């Protein structure tokens, strides 16, 4: 999971300038994302036990959501992409990467609620989430449904596979690194 998230973030960093993209890395796993803290794109790196920093991050993102909603309303545009086409000063895309989402429940109800609202409202505002988890039920269903694209690696329980990508003719591969991907409603094997 950590290697997958690392690959996603490095790929985004390679294809986007710092002026256009920032990362907020929430490393709730084994601290495997620490090296990404050196990327110029990384605005902040937060580990699981840094509760004060996490609280400040939540406040910062909530304020940014309000600011972006106001900017889009002033320009009378429906989303981040259209805003950046018409605005003189464009907005940066923000990617919030969460490794080991399973532990969010330990952070409390407020954290779960924050991520639910973020996953619902963020995409249209240019604030995107990428999260990893070991179980399909680690994330509330209402939050999970806000993710349009889903990737399932090897899972111990095959029924988790169907929860993540839906029913398909593909089955889980025993080969390490193989995944099932649900992208734009289609399921494929990688």
Q: Where would I find each of the regions flagged by the language model?
A:
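P-loop NTPase catalytic phosphate-binding loop
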Residues: 1-78, 85-174, 180-188
């Amino acid at each position: 999971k950590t290697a997958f998230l690392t690959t996603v973030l490095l790929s985004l960093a390679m294809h986007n300038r710092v002026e256009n993209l920032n990362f907020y890395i929430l490393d709730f796993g084994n601290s495997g994302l620490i090296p990404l803290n050196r990327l110029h794109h990384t605005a902040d790196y937060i580990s699981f036990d840094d509760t004060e920093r996490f609280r400040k991050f939540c406040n910062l993102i909530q304020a940014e959501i309000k600011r972006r909603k106001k900017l889009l309303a002033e320009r009378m545009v429906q989303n981040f992409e259209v805003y950046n086409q018409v605005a003189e000063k464009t907005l940066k895309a923000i990617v919030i990467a969460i490794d080991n989402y399973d532990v969010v429940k330990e952070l409390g109800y407020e954290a779960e609620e924050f991520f639910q609202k973020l996953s619902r409202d963020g995409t249209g505002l240019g604030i995107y989430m990428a999260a990893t988890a070991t179980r399909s039920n680690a994330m509330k269903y209402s939050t999970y449904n806000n993710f349009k694209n889903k990737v399932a690696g090897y899972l111990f329980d095959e029924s988790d596979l169907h929860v993540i990508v839906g029913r398909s003719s593909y089955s889980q591969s025993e080969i390490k690194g193989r995944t099932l991907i649900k992208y734009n409603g289609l399921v494929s094997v990688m």
